[in-house]
């Protein structure tokens, strides 16, 4: 089975991306063990991407293309427990930084709510869906939309509650603010609270914040430094193209977060590939 050259295809991982991820997965079969031949990890990884991209149930994985669904899901759970997808996200962000450079100067933070009809960890009544079960992802991106940090909470968690936690969850080391290295942070009016503002300023950001009740008025300094709040909204839109993320079916939050992290991996790879083309 040959790998395609772009993540625009549905489920095959490109060779160069696989070469980065494969070392994180460990041996397919423990040395000295007997029994049937192990399922190739590349095949299993492609199957996980298939689920992420198509949104199908695990049991609906085409067996003729991959392996029994129970086998694939077992390998996936093993990787989740080992933190493989979080490590892959961190690795791809470092790869993105090496190829293009993280654009720290302009960052944007916003949250999005997703339906979670089965409930589970980090779910709650959605304020935008008549109190039905939902989950929220709080996301921080750089100027291009590269995902830098993410926090998953219940849908009824106020944005301001997880804003500072999201800033503190950046998965690579953030450069110190210097005179020639200024960081701007763009927020919408949902974050217009004194504790959030104080926390953002304490983290050495120049804040661009739409004020509640003044949404149509320009922010001081925005003619010189126009805010880029739309960037993080676009990344949320990119994530929603992965059909498994449109509705959360995972009860355990670690399983859901792993799929989000894999989406971040593919988004970062696409940003680098697009720049190269």
List PLM regions with ranges.
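Short alpha-helical elements
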Residues: 1-277
């Amino acid at each position: 089975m040959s790998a395609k050259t772009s993540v625009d295809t549905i489920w095959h991982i490109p060779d160069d991306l696989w070469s980065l991820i494969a070392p994180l997965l460990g041996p397919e079969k423990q040395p000295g063990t007997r029994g049937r031949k192990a399922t190739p990890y590349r095949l299993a990884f492609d199957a996980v991407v298939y689920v992420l991209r198509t949104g199908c149930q695990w049991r609906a994985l085409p067996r003729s293309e991959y392996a029994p669904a129970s086998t694939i899901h077992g390998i996936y759970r093993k990787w989740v427990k080992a933190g493989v997808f979080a490590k892959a996200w961190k690795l791809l962000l470092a790869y993105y930084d090496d190829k293009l450079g993280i654009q720290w100067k302009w960052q944007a933070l916003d949250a999005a709510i997703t339906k979670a009809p089965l409930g589970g960890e980090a779910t709650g009544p959605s304020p935008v869906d008549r109190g039905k079960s939902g989950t929220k992802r709080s996301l921080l991106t750089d100027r291009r939309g590269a995902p830098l940090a993410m926090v998953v909470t219940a849908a009824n968690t106020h944005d301001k509650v997880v804003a500072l936690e999201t800033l503190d969850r950046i998965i690579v080391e953030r450069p110190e603010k210097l005179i020639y290295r200024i960081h701007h942070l763009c927020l919408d009016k949902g974050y217009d609270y004194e504790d959030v503002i104080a926390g953002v300023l304490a983290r050495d950001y120049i804040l661009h914040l739409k004020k509640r009740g003044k949404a149509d008025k320009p922010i001081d300094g925005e003619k010189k430094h126009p805010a880029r709040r739309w960037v993080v909204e676009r990344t949320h839109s990119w994530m929603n193209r992965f059909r498994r993320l449109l509705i959360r079916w995972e009860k355990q939050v670690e399983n859901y977060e792993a799929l989000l992290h894999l989406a971040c991996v593919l988004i970062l790879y696409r940003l680098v590939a697009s720049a190269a083309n």
